[in-house]
Every structure is written in structure tokens, then in C-alpha cells.
Amino acid sequence: MSRPILVFDSGIGGLSVLAEIRKSLPHSDYCYLFDNARLPYGELEEQVLIAGCVALVCDLVARTNAMIVVVACNTASTVVLPALRANLSIPVVGVVPAIKPAAQMSKSKRIGLLATPGTVKRHYTHELISQFADDCHVELFGCSELVMMAEQKIATGQMDMHRLADLLAPVVAAQLDVLVLGCTHFPMIQAELQQVLGAGVTLMDSGAAIAKRVVTLLTQQNLIVEERRVTNERETLGESAMQAFYTKAEISEGLTTTLIDCGFSTIERITTTN
């Protein structure tokens, strides 16, 4: 494995970001680290969150010789990014809720942000709204339960649509034309969200913007892998280029199958003391 792109999240939500990056950089190697032992991040004390994330990510960067870290978690991005950047010499990219493009796209100037309670209440989020959506009426919806529903869907293939409709009732009532998905888990259930909200609501996430930023940074450092590498007449891209690491004692058969279907050949538990 060459120097990989390390994508980090609390759970499986970051797979949506990894998929966007792979569209732009299909020949790169990838590590996916998900700290599912401490999911959901939005309920952790900030200092506990920072200490655990820094320890996990820095250890795996050292182990894999990663060339860039993508924090594919909105909660971690608003809290942990400065500490990670202070402890790493490689680029660290975070997630920014797509407030600016949502405000630009909205015709009714009624937009919403669906995220975890932690992201909704953070000062950074309100700064984004003031800076980029001052001409819009912005509704904020914080819901941790949707994160666990996305995890459950990946693990079992099942989604409680009645419960989803109940959770989204305030969003429907707000009569928005654009809704920002402010958690990387939410694109994993985008079809179900769209079904409940209807075709009149455009859903926006940050995946494509993150991928663009990663490409820019790696291009600046001349680290783009331009073509498939061939060893013994076989391409090394694929199974050998995809590694997944998790922190919980065990993961479900459904999640294991999902990771294999995504192309991961190595699925390994790592431990943390934080």
C-alpha cells in the first residue's frame, strides 16, 4: 500500500465522503477509521472527544504513513480540527456544512440545517449562517437519533419509516426549499429523507466540496496517484488499497458486508484508552 488517504468518522457516515473522494481520486489508497465505540460524538464532553480523536488519528497516521487526514464528521470538525493540526505535519481537512451553496440555491430563501445537536448549537455554525445566509430564514434541526438510524440501516438494511416521518415532521412543517445535511451520516439515508420530505426540498451535503479540497491539497504537494499500479500483471488498486479500522468490541455482519462491498479487504479493530 502506498501512502493512503485517511478518512475518519465516529461511524459509517464518513463512507459517503470517502465515496465522493474516490470519484475524484480513483487510484489512491484509502484507510477508513471509525470510532464506533464512542458513537455518537455529539454526546461527548469536548475535552474527552479531543483527547480520544487525537490519540486515535495520530496513532493510525504513524502506522499507515497517511498523506492526508479527512475528518468526515461535522461534530469532530468543529471541535477537534485545531488539536489534530497542531499534532500532525500532514494536511487535515474538515467538514463544513453546506450553508453557502444552500443559500445561493434557495429560491424561497427558506433553508434548513439538519445535524446533530452539537453541530446545531456550536458558535461556528451560527457564524456560517451569519456570513453566508444572512438573507435567508434558516431553521435549525438537531437530531442524534437519525445518526443511529443510519447506522442501523447499514447494519440491518432496515429503516423505520414511520419513526423517520415523526422525526422529520418539524422539517416538513418549516416549508423549506433547501435542506443542508449537516452530518455525514445523513447522505447514507438520503433516499429515505427525500421520500419523507418530498421532491420540493433539495438536499445538499458537503461531500463534493471536501473531495475538491483534498484534490487541491494533494495536487499542491504532487501526491496525486495518476494511474493504476501493476504488480505481477495484477492491478494493486482494489482490495489491497482499502483498509478499515474500528474501535468497538465487534461489528455486525451487515456492517462487515457493507465494508466488503465498498472494497475493503482489511477490516480490523484497534483499541483506544480514551
From Swiss-Prot:
Gene3D superfamilies: 3.40.50.1860. Its EC number is 5.1.1.3. InterPro entries: Asp/Glu/hydantoin_racemase (IPR015942), Asp/Glu_race (IPR001920), Asp/Glu_racemase_AS_1 (IPR018187), Asp/Glu_racemase_AS_2 (IPR033134), Glu_race (IPR004391). The keyword Isomerase applies. Substrate binds at D9, S10, Y41, G42, N74, T75, T184, H185. GO terms for molecular function: glutamate racemase activity. It comes from the Bacteria. It holds the Pfam family Asp_Glu_race. Pathway: Cell wall biogenesis; peptidoglycan biosynthesis. One of its GO terms (biological process) is peptidoglycan biosynthetic process. Keywords: Cell shape, Cell wall biogenesis/degradation, Isomerase, Peptidoglycan synthesis. It catalyses: L-glutamate = D-glutamate. The active site is at C73 (proton donor/acceptor), C183 (proton donor/acceptor). Belongs to the aspartate/glutamate racemases family. Provides the (R)-glutamate required for cell wall biosynthesis. This is Glutamate racemase. It comes from Shewanella baltica (strain OS155 / ATCC BAA-1091). The gene is murI.
